[in-house]
Amino acid sequence: MRTPLLSTLAIFAAAAWVWIHAAETPRYLVSHNPVLVELFTSEGCSSCPPADALLSKFDRQSRTGAEIVVLSEHVDYWNDLGWKDPYSSHVYSDRQNNYADRLGLSSVYTPQMVVDGTIEFVGSSARSANDAFARAFSAPKIPIHLSSITLVQPDILRAHIETEALTDSFGERDPEVYVAVALDHAESEVSRGENGGQRLAHTAVVRTLLKIGSVQHGQRFAQDVQLKLEPGTDPRHLRLIAFLQQPHQGRVIGVAVHSVGMN
């Protein structure tokens, strides 16, 4: 766990211990109730590479049965400390700050994982992640369907997002609908900062995150969206993610992912 300008031997030792235990066999079994895992990370943080690797492991686990939808959100508050993360955005720093306020944290830190918007922990802790998954897999979710994913222009992606009807069991407030575009895989040669001289690898790197509407109780949500891609983006290596989240970044009550894979 790292906060900029704060680095202690105790924090380093804790990060090292959880990384040693990252190879533990997950305790959760196959589940068809998907969960959303958000990793707040930075290429400028030396404690983050183990968390990046753990997120990649969860992404691979998702393809073998347990439905884990991962997002890597690179914050920008490390950018003045030796290395500017090319995938960072203040959008993700703001999102992390909102979680800190709602979850009662005194400050933000990296690496941090947030599961289904409600459980946060040091992002390199496999044990904490497995405990969070065991709780999250049992929570009910609203099915989300992604379809008609097409590239209408070289830099414009279009998709149809639809949910099943929202029931009273999910509370009285109308959940918000988010859509994200993420790179399947990304790598960087870091020349400066805490990770200087290393080649870092990332999974599901978010490049676009938008709130596109809300779902009213007793109703379905259905909408076509158009998303602008960054210049030079290869759509064959993108994934589209949609999720429902209770207002003010509350509990995630639905999530789906679909490979863009324009072959």
Residues covered by each model-derived region:
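Bacterial N-terminal signal peptides that target proteins for export
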Residues: 1-9
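Serine/threonine-rich low-complexity intrinsically disordered regions
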Residues: 4-5, 50, 230, 234
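Histidine-/acidic- and/or cysteine-rich, low-complexity loops and terminal segments associated
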Residues: 8-11, 23
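Hydrophobic helical h-region of N-terminal Sec-dependent signal peptides
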Residues: 10, 14-18
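Active-site-proximal cofactor/substrate-binding loop regions of enzyme domains
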Residues: 17-109
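Short, conserved sequence motifs used for protein processing/export or organelle targeting and
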Residues: 84-112, 116-263
